């Protein structure tokens, strides 16, 4: 399976609700590498790399997020 790297901006109520920690836990569960951080504009930025099917699974998960999050937008691009 090919490895891919994805970069996302997640908007909505995604800060102060455990979004970063939950994203790290989901990425670990999917055996992905990467990082996640809060941005000053209220969004969360995520970069991750791994097998394509697992990377796409995290992309789908970001659209829902953890229980207390309210995701309103996810912008994803594939990195070279």
Spans of features found by a protein language model:
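Intrinsically disordered, low-complexity, mixed-charge
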Residues: 1-80
